[in-house]
């Protein structure tokens, strides 16, 4: 279960409590007690001037504003891309850890989060090109790319079109590696107009459905009600899925001998089956994590973070 403590958009000092994730058997009273004790005893860390104020920034590409958060100041660079219908907060439990020894950018995809909602060409190829141009505008020549779900397909497309920009790929529950995809989930997510309608679809993202609480559903509905969002989601979906299957596969990209690829999957993924990971050639480093679902980077954040850090340092 996820209990938000910080308000959306609130600026907090390093080390402050954003929220609490617990097992479903933990009572509300126990959570309240923990939060109260933490807040009473919390002393903000002293941070250097350059580390203060992690804030949303924007880069403009062909008339589109893409929002991103930058953390870390290492010489090496990583880029995090979320999936369909998500936003950069999908990396809430990952970005700061991954940024301990490098500079890490987490983007809102075009049409998502705080990025421009009306994007013209909504094909994966066009979205991937916009993200590549964004990184080049930020004067990044090469990066370690991390993609979740549709974000993984975008990483594969970028690697296919601009291999010199991709030092490595980490693909988490990635699209683009098989035919099967849960189309009823995608359509239900786009078309749901209330918490009651949306909840059963969002629950498919997690193995622990107690993580799907009222606040999460309200935040998703607020996003979906923004002018232009439903249209852009439908447009992206139409280019992403065809005849009940994924419209494109990029398995040949990960199978190249010179590709550095890490694949992570939740064994209980109900959106993109873990069999896609099992079907990959044996030389690709693959980890299928038991008891976790499609949002494995949130449900098993510590384990996923360690796998990525170890992969980068290998």
Language-model features: where?
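Mobile cofactor-carrier "swinging-arm" domains
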Residues: 1-54
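Active-site loop/oxyanion-hole signature of alpha/beta-hydrolase fold enzymes
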Residues: 57, 61, 105-150, 154, ...
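Conserved HGGG/HGGXW glycine-rich cap/lid loop of the alpha/beta-hydrolase fold
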Residues: 64, 70-114
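Flexible "cap/lid" loop of the alpha/beta hydrolase fold
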Residues: 156-160, 167-198
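Conserved alpha/beta-hydrolase catalytic His-Asp/Glu region
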Residues: 192-256
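Short beta-strand/loop motif that positions the catalytic acidic residue
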Residues: 257, 263-265
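Acidic catalytic loop of the alpha/beta-hydrolase fold
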Residues: 267-272
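Catalytic histidine-centered segment of alpha/beta-hydrolase-like enzymes
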Residues: 292-305
């Amino acid at each position: 279960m996820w209990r938000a403590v910080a308000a959306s958009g609130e600026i907090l000092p390093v080390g402050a409590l954003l929220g609490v994730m617990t097992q479903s058997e933990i009572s509300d009273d126990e959570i309240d007690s923990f939060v109260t004790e933490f807040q009473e005893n919390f002393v903000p860390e002293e941070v250097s001037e350059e580390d203060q104020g992690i804030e949303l920034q924007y880069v403009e590409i062909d008339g589109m504003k893409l929002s991103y958060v930058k953390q870390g100041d290492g010489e090496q660079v990583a880029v995090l891309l979320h999936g369909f219908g998500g936003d950069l907060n999908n990396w809430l439990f990952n970005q700061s850890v991954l940024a301990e020894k490098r500079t890490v950018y987490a983007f809102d995809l075009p049409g998502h989060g705080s990025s421009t909602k009306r994007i013209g060409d909504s094909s994966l190829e066009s979205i991937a090109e916009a993200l590549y141009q964004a990184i080049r505008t930020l004067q990044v020549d090469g990066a370690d790319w991390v993609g979740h779900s549709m974000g993984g397909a975008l990483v594969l497309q970028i690697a296919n079109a601009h291999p010199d920009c991709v030092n490595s790929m980490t693909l988490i529950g990635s699209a683009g590696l098989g035919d099967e995809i849960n189309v009823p989930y995608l359509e239900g997510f786009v078309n749901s107009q209330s918490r009651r309608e949306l909840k059963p679809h969002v629950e498919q993202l997690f193995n622990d459905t107690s993580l799907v609480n009222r606040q999460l559903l309200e935040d998703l509905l607020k996003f979906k009600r923004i002018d232009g969002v439903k249209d852009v989601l439908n447009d992206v979906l139409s280019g992403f899925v065809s005849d009940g299957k994924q419209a494109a596969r990029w398995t040949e990209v990960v199978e190249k001998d010179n590709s550095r690829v890490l694949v992570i999957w939740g064994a209980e993924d109900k959106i993109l089956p873990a069999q896609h990971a099992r079907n990959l050639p044996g030389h690709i480093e693959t980890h299928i994590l038991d008891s976790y679902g499609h949002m494995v980077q949130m449900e098993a954040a510590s384990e996923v973070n360690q796998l990525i850090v170890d992969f980068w340092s290998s």
